[in-house]
Amino acid sequence: MGSEGRGEQTFRTDQDNGLILSEPVPPEDLDQFRSDVFQALESCGFPPCPGEVMVRNPLWSKTVAEFGDDFRRWLALSDEAGAMNIAIFYDAEAVAGDPGLLRAAKQDLIDAVRGEEVQLARFARAVDAFPTPIGFFNNLVTSKADGDAVDLKKGGIFPIVHGVRALALEKGLSETNTAARIARLAELGTFEPEFARELTEAFRYLMTLRLDAQIAEKAATSLVRPGELTTMERDLLRDAFQIAKRLREVVRRRFNLAMF
């Protein structure tokens, strides 16, 4: 699930997984399996998810029908937790077992949001969770608290991922990867071909820059110090943030976020 499901994880992070059952299983039989899966992954170096998005959490191991009930409950909520759970599930990719179960559950989610403009807008509004770190004169706005760095994830990667995800969910797309979603949205006319190309290039540049920073720091960081970049790298970073900002505007207009 999450960045792993989208095929966009760089450094290994914590566990993000779930289990879809073809039929109900007695809790006493399921509990041991949940624990075994969790412990096996932990022994391989994948620490627990702080948000408990793991097989061992009963919330994330259910039948298709039970997940369907959850989707409708999450959509009815106006809080961030419900939107986050929908985003997590929508990005999921099957890695074992019957992939048809995941397809069926995702179709249930798509059916649940079809035509639900208010719920889709509530989901999409997270695109504005963080400001774009670009100033009035197109300068990069750094954070002194972070050592004069900019946060690539908050400033560019997340708004692109979530903005594209919201538009993809509205269209009922099955793709999970962000670049693949952009391509399909361009085919459907949501994006102009040129903007789709620019958006894909901006996203890939931000991801590459983050990976370079993680390799240099030997840690899962999203912070980059513009002062340590070349002039060309800073120019490309500004361009990437501006494209992410343009996507925000597309999402705001499409879902009338000024009303929320």
Where are these regions (language model features)?
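Conserved catalytic core of two-metal-ion nucleotidyltransferases
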Residues: 26-89, 96, 100-108, 112, ...
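Structural beta-strand/beta-sheet cores of well-ordered domains, especially the beta-sheet scaffolds
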Residues: 13-17, 37, 44, 132, ...
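Short glycine-enriched loops at secondary-structure junctions
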Residues: 1-6
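Catalytic metal-binding acidic patch
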Residues: 7-28
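Structured core elements
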Residues: 18-20, 50, 208-210
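Flexible, active-site-adjacent loop/turn segments at secondary-structure boundaries
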Residues: 9-10, 52, 65, 69, ...
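Alpha-helical hydrophobic packing sites
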Residues: 16-18, 47, 255
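Conserved nucleotidyltransferase catalytic core and NTase-mimicking acidic/glycine-rich helix/loop elements
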Residues: 101-260
